[in-house]
């Protein structure tokens, strides 16, 4: 067989780093409705140390409520953040309406949500007080169904009919919407714009739709009036309990219907988030709420996330028997054709999804290349593939679509990452039209340089013999194509698009302008998606055809160098012109197994100050992982955006916990032989602690173990030095990484 060398995800001289996520368990939790009728306190999720909850206010009178204020108090529980209301006090708490949700028509419901900690106690259900909490009737909870009702709307749900991945509450007001000043956009409520005359706008810190655009929809959609009428929702038409009440326009349930005061729901009509809904088939509303947290259909979306790669292309060795120096696009699956006397390991993608879900995963980042979208590209088809025939794809495009659909069936959310301009150029690109020389051009003893490939049609050096021309127009076309997959495949799990991986070669001004165009392109096709924006680097313009004219980029302290994709230092003062509830910042950050940064140097070795990478190795510099120093850099580079209310989802973090020992390259073992402690594991622990404390979500790189500088969550017998012939084989989960991730997620 042709031996396949592991694709090094990045040359160790590349500048990258990453983070982690504070996850929320999805256990189905019964709620308690106390307080006077008209107000409900609903526990929507709970885990060991915390919970999420909502307060729902139903107007059960015959008069319009203009403005509301409610209060509640705990014994030991405390609120840590709140969205869609103004919060005051500190146990007791008070919450009042925002400008857009203060008016409640008779028979209608509004809600706001919050997250809290139990402080070693149990999850409480306190009484809610306020003038709006009078009149009507309260709800009841049975042993196998969860139903709430008010005097103005009624619902009937049979036992065992609630199956939801995000909430345990189904309210009878699911078919009632707030009327006036809103647009029912194909089943989803948005505010009507005041000053925007056509298309979509952004006013009062929220997305809105112009009256002319809203009115152009076919019936029954359009501008929502003040009247109400009964509606009947058929079996399997309501997607999860997020449809149980009217939610904010920017995060409303896609299963809301224009207006009603009563509804009938059959025994199978409340289903998981992967089911169909009244909205456009295959779509789900993904938003970032005012607290910077991810939501789906108005409910908090747990983001226990990992990377699963391969479809973006790998690097084959120059002596491969079938595909020398090729770049096949094939998801790693732990089942290579030559294993077990060519019978394969038996592992399937479904098996891996099942195992990942059992470990807590709710979300996956899926890297691709532009060529992945081409079903006819030979690098996505046999005979250039290595997976066992039992799981082998027909082509890379089909594999992409099949993976998305299978993840949807497993209630795993997906976001697609355009990982490079070319499956051959790979991680090196840094820009759409990247040209060599690349960062690994002079790497000693390395078989996988790609100096003969360029993504630019012009101004290439003499080393280039193969051009995969890529530019902004092709990129925007790819974004539109990906945005259309939700409708094409009939799925509701495509969160958004990570528009380009590690754009380290742009200045912030350049990258900001590009992502604004990316937003417009995506939004034209799919207004339900998020736009996921990575950071830049500390320098720009090295891959633009002028490698000697690198431009320094502001990133805060020069002693704290950002990795590729980490630098969002300028984003707070000069953010992209993208609605805040559609924008998700996604920096990358890594420890020493990927690149030894200057901030890792032992301050006791003054001769090592400012050194990094190979220079630090040659000087035999010691590595000291100081969380205080690391956090200063993270705060400058992206952490401060959390306090500004932006959503942050770290796109990549992770590493080889045994570096520079087991599983490391021979070059790293030689260069860093004086390092005998678990410095990369220490770095990962510091990162996980920081992100958990900040409430920042993150995606671990990677689930599969074929990344040469990080390995994976899955263990492998492969070792590039002692067991190179075991490449592509998986065993169980690395218990150290399991503990790291479970601690970070609160599991």
Swiss-Prot record:
Residues 1-37 form the signal peptide. Residues 227-281 have a biased composition (Low complexity). Pfam families: CBM_10, CBM_2, Cellulase. The keyword DNA-binding does not apply. Residues 226-283 are annotated as: Disordered. It comes from the Bacteria. SUPFAM superfamilies: (Trans)glycosidases, Carbohydrate-binding domain, Type X cellulose binding domain, CBDX. Belongs to the glycosyl hydrolase 5 (cellulase A) family. This is Endoglucanase C.
